[in-house]
Amino acid sequence: MNKETGMLKPWIEAQARLVEVAAGRAPADLVIRGGQWVNVHTREVIPGMDVAVADGRVAYVGPDAGPSVGPGTQVIEADGRFMVPGLIDAHMHVESGMLTPAGFAAAVIPHGTTTIFHDPHEIANVLGLEGVRLMRDESLLQPISMFTQMPSCAPSAPGLETTGQPITEGEVAQAMGWDGIVGLGEMMNFPGVASGDRQMLTEIAATRAAGKTVGGHYASPDLGRPFHAYVAGGANDDHETTTEAQGIARVRQGMGCMMRLGSAWYDVESQITAITEKGLDPRFFILCTDDSHSGTLVNDGHMNRVVRHAVDCGCDPLVAIQMATINAASHFGLERELGSITPGRRADVILTSDLRSLPIETVIAQGVVVAETGKLLVDCPRIAWPEAARDSVHLGRSLTGADFAVRATGDSARVRVIGVVENQAPTRALTAQLPIRDGVVEPQGETCHIALVERHRGTGGVVNGFVSGFGYQGRMAVASTVAHDSHHMIVVGTDRDSMAAAANHLGRIGGGVTVFRDGEELATVALPIAGLMSDRPAAEVAEAAQGIVKAMQDCGCTLNNAYMQHSLLALVVIPELRISDLGIVDVTRFELVDLMV
């Protein structure tokens, strides 16, 4: 680390000093003494080892770093604790935490995360390429390594939704030349790739030509020809796998299988048996979070939580650590830069007293002690977010309860219903026979109203449908401008007037999530940046977000982390049934369908 600029020197600029420190001819900046070295290259623990660090990089790992200790060297006594490489999240979306990159970094550093690969396709759908640049700019300022993937699909499914700012193949090619861009974000338009869509293939080709990694997203159980065509199209990984067979299929075809444990996704347990029971080589299995709520980050952890979960599922702790360090680094071609405690790599080290429960006691990132016993010790710099990023909710008019009415004739109607599945991203395509009163289809039982309100161009458009699985009761509504992936406004409720009140409230405050009951506000978390993020500290955002969760529960919701489920109801690239600004989407067939059956 350059003490004057705070920036990590490239290895080539640090090489000569690393040699001198390793040889004991020059003092190190930092020495960790007397630790148990977790070597992820050999999958072994070697006791009685020291680590010497210079210019933010590991210079020496061996039994005696004494010759590298000078008057100005910071010495940390490991006292027999394990020295673990800093943890890596190989696939995630910063915006899901309702935080900017600075806020996210501040939240996860105390949990031992020192590297993040993030795909800002949420803000890309609202602000386009400029939104990506802003996320990249703030990421580069952080004391940990935050690599940005250029979003590939905005909109995620052309013809099935309308985004705020579409991303073009020319913009993808342009971004591949930016500092901090490590590859292409998840290629969600898997039918497009499999059918040879020119734009999708051009984006992938531009990424591969730049020598960078293509993120995958094949959200279909079909492992036949469409799957093989998608793999042949160039995607390098996939995090949408939910079963052992799906994960194995990816790895057999040369992809990385990214097993996720987010706030609402619990896909590790069902896939890790490929390693723990079938004994497959774990090199191409990688751990990630995908989407983590701010409350999860503050209260439960980040990648340390994922590693612990993998161990609880029967995984060898050393294998679990490999899947959250060297496997991820290797996947992105960065194994010579990070992912292990070895010479030349970024000095990202965790000190912990137990590999199974993984308490994070000391965190070192790029040679700097950044956290100690859960306390952040460094600043996470922020950019000045422009006014355009803070003025992104345009409803065009004030909404009324009548806007959320589904009109029909007769005594009852059979309608399509989006069935939410707890702890899973996919939904079920259900139907229900609902009563008609005064010409309006009324929800009953488990079924609620759902509506998508256009918020990018101020058209005043509202698309209505029905959803089940939340368990809501009474006269209530939840509204959110976090609505993957095009991020219009999603409103779910049992009462149309409460739905209108909630939607109008978010229009006034510039975005966020709110819960109304009997027409009155119960809880709100304001997200003024693109309607997706707050620039407040993580703990403050988490507290407000917890208020949302509690308000949902007070309205009868029984789902685990219902907010995350709520935010995905418009995600038209994950089966089976979704809602968009263009209508109801059958994702299994990738086509718009009538609400009425």
From Swiss-Prot:
GO terms for molecular function: adenine deaminase activity. The keyword Transmembrane helix does not apply. It comes from the Bacteria. Its EC number is 3.5.4.2. It catalyses: adenine + H2O + H(+) = hypoxanthine + NH4(+). Keywords: Hydrolase, Manganese. InterPro entries: Adenine_deam, Adenine_deam_C, Amidohydro-rel, Metal-dep_hydrolase_composite, Metal_Hydrolase. Belongs to the metallo-dependent hydrolases superfamily. Adenine deaminase family. NCBIfam families: ade (TIGR01178). This is Adenine deaminase. It comes from Paracoccus denitrificans (strain Pd 1222). The gene is ade.
